[in-house]
Amino acid sequence: MKTTAAPLSPRKTPIQRRSVATVEALHTATIQVLVTEGLSRCTTTRVASRAGMSVGSLYQYYPNRDALLSGVLELHLTKITDALEAACISVRGKPVREMACAMVQAFLSLKLANPDESKALYGVAAERDGARLMGVMYERMVNDIAQTLITAPDNTFPDPLFTAHMALGVITGPTRAFLEGFIPHDYTDQFQAHLSRLLGDYLKG
């Protein structure tokens, strides 16, 4: 017997101020449960309890746990992608080292603003809809970087799109290693400067 996958889209889009506040409360509660109890124990019951509402109220906005987690992850990724896009636009026509500093600063300003949240959401990204969301946002970021790189006066890239893929990897790889504790947090004060230099040196060739 063929089964139908449960929907991952929200039941309704919050329009009224009260609805927006409710969704924000659910997102905050979800992050808190993820951080304190882990992904496996992040249930709709626990999230609703943490948010101070009934499970029935939660289901008015999200039909199931997967949809809730997907919504939280999508918001997180959208904020980062939007910030990187704004940074790219702000440095178009600038030298590549200036571009590198702006891209790294924009990415880290959100990723490191709440390290526990960022780390917890890596686990959510491995869930059912995470790969799709990551793919959509990844493509946006790569395109934004590529469109910016071609405006650099010291642009020497034979393939700006491939360079953009590599540049994004230079940013995201060390950042994840830092958030997951592989890079000791003793280096917090130096991390952004070193990452900016690493990316700048790569782009400068």
Label each PLM-derived region with a short phrase.
Residues 86-89, 120-128:
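Short linear capping/connector segments at secondary-structure termini
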Residues 29-33, 110, 170:
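Short amphipathic alpha-helical elements of helix-turn-helix/winged-helix folds
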Residues 1-21:
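N-terminal intrinsically disordered/low-complexity leader segments
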Residues 23, 44, 66, 70, ...:
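Short, structured helix-loop boundary elements
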Residues 19-30, 47, 72-84:
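Generic hydrophobic, amphipathic alpha-helix propensity
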Residues 75-84, 98-101, 105, 109-116, ...:
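Amphipathic alpha-helical packing segments from all-alpha helical-bundle domains
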Residues 2, 118-123, 131, 150-198:
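Hydrophobic/aromatic-rich alpha-helical bundle segments in the mid-to-C-terminal region
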Residues 25, 29, 33-67:
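Helix-turn-helix
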